[in-house]
Regions:
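Conserved small/polar residues in nucleotide/adenosyl-binding loops
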Residues: 283-290
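Generic structural signal for well-ordered, non-transmembrane alpha-helical segments
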Residues: 22-25, 67, 188-191, 195, ...
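Hydrophobic alpha-helical scaffolding
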Residues: 10, 134-137, 179-183, 187, ...
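Extended amphipathic alpha-helical segments enriched in small hydrophobics
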Residues: 181-239
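N-terminal low-complexity segments that are often proline-rich with Ser/Thr-Pro
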Residues: 293-294
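C-terminal helix-coil-helix/basic helical segment that borders enzyme active sites and/or dimer interfaces
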Residues: 227-260, 264-282
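Internal helix-loop-helix
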Residues: 1-31, 83
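FAD-binding core of flavoproteins
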Residues: 38-185
Length: 294
């Protein structure tokens, strides 16, 4: 999108972004691609919100950069990220131009702070001898609300500032890549769930029962359909004028549409196969008083 802006407007956004991308790659940095705003009243545009901070916006333009306010919500991996790359979250009109901004800041920039989202079993990980309940201790998932309280962004890290007519293009392209990636990451989780369901059937002594096999086959079919969608939108992409590879946006949307449906059915079938199961903690499995009974 920065390339198209430069071609039409004579700006230097694409050069800035290319230099930033090199900086990220050369320093092996993790970047939080942040698009989702709190949004407030969804029936109103950004500029018509009662609280102007419901969408990220520029509050001051200086000779050497801009000052921004707002927040980005549901940011997976934000606390683990070195940088935050901010993008608009909706297509915009001229009245919303102060909200049409894209920029990058380090996580420790002055005025940036994060509110960590609670997990349903997060305190369980703090129990003594939790071990197995920790999951992947080094790469555990999390989400955070990233707040920007009058944060200064130098010009070299600004990639869009009030070019409202390009906000929709940026949103559509980023969303396409995001939806394409779901054809891989969600399918990987599905593989694990299918394996766990098959193991539960073995434990229950019914791996050869026809209705169990039918359900496992359906789970595999649904999961591989999602994978096929991810492959399709990736393979059907094309080279863009800027030199980057753009996945097929229509097929990426099909991929995400199926992702919003099929994993729930896969999980429902897993519940049918597993039956009632009380999942105790690893601490109880190892405790002398309870281990033998469990």
């Amino acid at each position: 999108t920065t390339y198209e802006m430069d071609q039409k407007l004579g700006t230097e956004y694409h050069k800035r972004f290319t230099e930033y991308m090199k900086f990220v790659q050369e320093n092996d940095l993790t970047v939080d691609g942040a698009m989702t705003d709190p949004k407030g009243d969804r029936s109103l545009s950004p500029s018509r919100q009662e609280d102007p901070d419901m969408y990220m916006h520029v509050v001051e333009v200086r000779e050497d950069g801009i000052v921004v306010r707002g927040a980005k919500a549901h940011q997976t991996g934000a606390v683990n990220s070195h940088e935050h790359l901010i993008m608009p979250t909706v297509a915009m009109k001229e009245e919303d131009k102060d909200y049409a901004i894209s920029f990058a800041v380090p996580s420790d920039a002055e005025g940036v702070f994060m509110v960590y989202g609670r997990q349903s079993c997060d305190t369980r990980k703090m129990e003594e001898n939790a071990d197995m309940d920790l999951g992947n201790a080094q790469y555990g998932g999390h989400e955070a609300l990233v707040v920007f309280d009058n944060v200064f962004v130098p010009n070299e890290r600004v990639f869009m500032c009030r070019e409202y007519e390009f906000a929709g293009m940026m949103v559509e392209r980023f969303a396409g890549y995001h939806r394409q990636s779901y054809g891989g990451c969600k399918v990987g989780v599905g593989d694990v769930l299918i394996g766990a369901a098959a193991l539960a059937a073995d434990y229950n002594g019914v791996p050869k029962a026809n209705h169990i096999k039918d359900k496992l086959i359906e789970m595999i079919h649904l999961n591989e359909t999602l994978y096929a969608c991810g492959i399709a939108c990736s393979a059907e992409g094309e080279k863009m004028p800027a030199g980057n590879y753009q996945i097929n946006l229509l097929l990426a949307n099909v991929c995400k549409q199926n992702i919003t449906r099929m994993p729930y059915e896969i999980a429902r079938l897993a519940e049918d196969i597993a039956g009632g199961l009380m999942a105790v903690s690893y601490t109880h499995l190892r405790a002398h008083e309870t281990s033998q009974d469990l």
